[in-house]
Amino acid sequence: DRPLSRGLGDVYKRQGLFTMKDFESYEAQIREPIIGSYRDNLVFTSGPPSGGGITLLTALNILSYFDLAKFKSDSAVTYHLLAEALRRGHNNRSHFVGDPDYFDVPVSQLLSKERTKELAKTIDLKKATKSTVVKPLELTTESRDTTHYSIIDNEGNAVSNTYTLGYSFGSGVTIPGTGILMNNQMNNFAYRYGDKKERGRGASTGNRFEPGKNPMSTMAPTMIFIKEGELILVTGSPGGSLIPAAIL
């Protein structure tokens, strides 16, 4: 505890809000994955408080309404569909996701056939959808301090793991004597709902600051199975809000 206490001293000097009680009462939560399907494959990915899985599954659901085989993989139409599907996925994430211990995230509604059909119908193959229809977030400069690894051993055990410091070197505070960098994930909360000045942060009411709450992220460690249960892909990516696009 002594090194941690010294680390908190550095946090206080920078007007940080952490206390020893925050660390002593913290418990890692084991949550069920959210599951979608795409072209007869089952896609398992992370659910809230991460919004990355919601973004990814929304995009895959929308793309299933289009016959991508009709277009070349590197065609303008294919890239257009990917972009439009991801825009709608990020819209779901940014306005309806938060820590499920504090906010009722309507996962089943966001990923429902009705919602997907409604979103798919708004896509025009010949032009981009107006931003008034798909509420955008400003582009952010993503740091390179998220790491992802995917592992399968010779017995078939698989791990898809994403972890992050947030920005480069996290908060810039190291716990003395440990080499542990403290992250700056408080940055992933929405400071004020719908605040246009907060670049790229999810504006969902469920992602407001609150003691004990986990902020939204876009991490999306993913595993894909065929319907018979065989694992065919373990994937994920660093990249902040770009993670779902990298996986897709």
Q: Locations of the language-model features?
A:
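M16/insulysin-pitrilysin zinc metalloprotease superfamily fold
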Residues: G53-L68, I224-L233, G239-L248
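Structured, charged N-terminal subsegments at the starts of enzyme catalytic cores
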Residues: K13-R87
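Internal maturation/activation junctions in enzymes
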Residues: G16, F66-L165, G177-T178, Q185-M186, ...
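Short, small/polar residue-rich loop motifs at catalytic or cofactor-binding pockets
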Residues: I30, S143-T146, S168, S217-M219
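Glycine-rich phosphate/pyrophosphate-binding beta-alpha loops
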Residues: F44-G53, S150, T162-V173, S237-P244
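Short acidic-glycine loop/turn motifs at beta-strand connectors
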Residues: Y38-R39, D153-E155, F225-G229
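Single conserved hydrophobic/aromatic residue that forms the stacking wall/gate
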Residues: D1-Y12
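Active-site rim segments in enzyme catalytic domains, especially the processed small/beta chain
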Residues: F18-T19, A158-K227, L233
